[in-house]
């Protein structure tokens, strides 16, 4: 199982020295496995880093390996080997749940039909993913080759060029927002939050930000349950603490850091639930668990969540310089730990 956080900094994990944020479940992986002090992502931004992880190639070798728009085509060459295809060839059932942001389909894809190529074309047997990112449209989940829960009588339309007639935007209709943008993020409104890009229709399929952690945990546990009697590979791709940071109500106020801290607490809870489920199924000693982050931390990444104002004495990058988007160390120097209970001796490297 690879658990991949989104914009989590080296100093955001208590196993790496955070005293303000407590992450007991992520810490369990570090304490019961090997905690690496020099773990690096391949890029200080999302899509290139994730491309590198799954393809085994440095992103600078791929011309379009950049932060992708929400309707970008699939970034992978489907005839090339990937991490999931290699494991599938070795007899593993492979699945991805959570954030994707690696493109889907081609330039002229109809979101109301089959969405391909995608994860299933690069080696995953099963997929339940966010179509792009939680701040980009379309705000839907894609299960296999289709949008989950889409009503054919209410088709979805997506554009990154212009708005659809009559549709409100964060720029023109700020009175409709419960979370306001600090820069960009002022286009189509969904769930009281304006996003990047324009979208219309598909109401029955739109996700609820507050439920996202539960949705992805449910699907991850279901994948494990379906495949517990045979070898499996799960890419559990967390969406936290990427913006917009909208925790479930039960996590609101769990930290002193506002929404950014609260969604990290939510992510830590999800990791704990997954670890507990492996314990329950007696799979822990037969499962390698890898935890890391796609890039370093950022406080204000487009929404007014008081991340800067409430940060206090917390140091998301630890003692490192820089963060997300930066070529300084904290852009790519991330938490990285590997646990294989009974086979890997706990320690620090």
Question: Residue spans of the language-model regions?
Answer:
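Formylglycine-dependent sulfatase
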Residues: 1-349
């Amino acid at each position: 199982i690879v658990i991949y956080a989104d914009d989590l900094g080296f100093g955001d994990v208590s196993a790496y020295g955070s005293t303000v944020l407590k992450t007991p479940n992520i810490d369990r992986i570090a304490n019961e496995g090997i905690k690496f002090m020099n773990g690096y992502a391949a890029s200080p931004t999302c899509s290139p880093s994730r491309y590198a992880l799954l393809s085994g190639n440095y992103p600078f070798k791929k011309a379009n390996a950049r932060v992708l728009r929400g309707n970008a085509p699939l970034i992978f060459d489907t005839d090339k080997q990937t991490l999931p295809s290699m494991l599938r060839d070795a007899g593993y059932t492979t699945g991805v749940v959570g954030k994707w942001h690696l493109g889907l389909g081609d330039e002229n894809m109809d979101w109301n039909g089959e969405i391909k190529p995608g994860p299933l074309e690069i080696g995953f047997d099963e997929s339940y993913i966010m179509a792009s990112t939680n701040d980009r449209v379309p705000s839907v989940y894609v299960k296999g080759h289709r949008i989950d829960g889409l009503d054919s009588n209410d088709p979805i339309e997506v554009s990154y060029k212009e708005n659809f007639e009559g549709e409100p935007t964060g720029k023109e209709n700020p009175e409709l927002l419960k979370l306001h943008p600090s820069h960009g993020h002022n286009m189509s409104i969904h769930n009281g939050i304006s996003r990047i890009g324009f979208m219309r229709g598909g109401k029955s399929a739109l996700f609820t930000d507050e439920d996202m952690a539960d949705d992805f945990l449910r699907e991850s546990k279901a994948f494990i349950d379906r495949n517990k009697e045979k070898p499996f590979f799960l890419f559990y791709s967390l969406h936290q603490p990427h913006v917009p940071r909208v925790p479930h109500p039960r996590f609101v106020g769990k930290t002193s850091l506002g929404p950014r801290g609260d969604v990290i607490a939510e992510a830590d809870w999800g990791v704990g639930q997954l670890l507990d489920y492996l314990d329950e199924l007696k799979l822990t000693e037969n499962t390698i668990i890898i935890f890391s982050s796609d890039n370093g931390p950022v406080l204000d990444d487009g929404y007014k969540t008081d991340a800067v104002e409430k940060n206090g004495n917390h140091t998301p990058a630890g003692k490192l310089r820089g963060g997300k988007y930066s070529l300084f160390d904290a852009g790519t120097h991330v938490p990285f730990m590997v646990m294989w209970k009974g086979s890997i001796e706990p320690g620090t490297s």
